[in-house]
């Protein structure tokens, strides 16, 4: 998992409440057994004018010119600004995969759905909760200034705006540690690989019958 320390990026404003996971990555794209390739289909039903299916050549599909991510000023955005209850709906880890593979490193919103919120951390995508008043101000700034950027300093737990304003945010010490070091669940486990091997060797020596396989 990619480490997250300080990130500066263009902000894209998704001015909709209750954006659910089916909007983030529609159900037909969940058939893949791979963990990659979801970025081109993030927000598929809003992003394109036709119906998308797995395996299509997205470069040949008609884009929706009214959708925010198709507007030139936001096409290189890496910070998503959203409204309350972002990521609601069914539980699918494909949603943070799609957003991250699109190019987003962080999402700022007044609130997130719990499962989506947790899945973001597990996949190196930083969800930041600010107040509705703060988010409203950032929407206004994003609309007012072309190429509006924010700097997110995870170590300091603050979002810095170009006008000098700072927006502190909360994050647990464990989640912060994992993001700063690029540890997902597997990475955390592998840090203890030698202890795991030692335990397995001792277990096998003391209880060898547990390793026997039934035949027939």
Swiss-Prot record:
Q: Does the keyword Amino-acid biosynthesis apply?
A: yes
Superkingdom to which the source organism belongs: Bacteria
Question: CDD domains attached here?
Answer: IPMI_Swivel
What pathway does the UniProt record associate with this protein?
A: Amino-acid biosynthesis; L-leucine biosynthesis; L-leucine from 3-methyl-2-oxobutanoate: step 2/4
Q: Name one GO molecular function term.
A: 3-isopropylmalate dehydratase activity
What are the annotated GO cellular component locations? 3-isopropylmalate dehydratase complex
Give the E.C. number(s).
4.2.1.33
Name the catalysed reactions. Answer: (2R,3S)-3-isopropylmalate = (2S)-2-isopropylmalate
Q: Please name the SUPFAM superfamilies in this protein's record.
A: LeuD/IlvD-like
UniProt KW keywords: Amino-acid biosynthesis, Branched-chain amino acid biosynthesis, Leucine biosynthesis, Lyase
BP GO terms, sorted: L-leucine biosynthetic process
The similarity annotation says:
Belongs to the LeuD family. LeuD type 1 subfamily.
Subunit structure comment from the entry = Heterodimer of LeuC and LeuD.
Stated role? Catalyzes the isomerization between 2-isopropylmalate and 3-isopropylmalate, via the formation of 2-isopropylmaleate.
The protein's name is 3-isopropylmalate dehydratase small subunit
Its taxonomic path starts at: Bacteria, Pseudomonadati, Pseudomonadota, Betaproteobacteria, Burkholderiales
């Amino acid at each position: 998992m990619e480490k997250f320390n300080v990130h500066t990026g263009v902000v894209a404003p998704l001015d909709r409440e209750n954006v659910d996971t089916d909007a983030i990555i529609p159900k037909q794209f969940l058939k893949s057994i791979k963990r990659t390739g979801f970025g081109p289909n993030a927000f598929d039903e809003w992003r394109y004018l036709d119906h998308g299916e797995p395996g299509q050549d997205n470069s040949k599909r008609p884009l929706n010119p009214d959708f925010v991510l198709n507007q030139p000023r936001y096409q290189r955005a890496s910070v998503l600004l959203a409204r309350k209850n972002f990521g609601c709906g069914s539980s699918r880890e494909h949603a943070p995969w799609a957003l991250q593979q699109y190019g987003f490193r962080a999402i700022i919103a007044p609130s997130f759905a719990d499962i989506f919120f947790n899945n973001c951390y597990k996949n190196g995508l930083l969800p930041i909760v600010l107040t509705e008043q703060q988010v409203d101000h950032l929407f206004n700034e994003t609309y007012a200034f072309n190429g509006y950027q924010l700097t997110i300093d995870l170590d300091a737990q603050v979002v810095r705006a170009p006008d000098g304003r700072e927006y502190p945010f909360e994050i647990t010490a464990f989640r912060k540690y994992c993001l700063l070091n690029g540890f997902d669940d597997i990475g955390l486990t592998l840090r203890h690989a030698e202890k795991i091997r030692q335990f397995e060797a001792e277990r096998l020596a003391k209880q060898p019958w547990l390793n026997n396989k039934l035949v027939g």
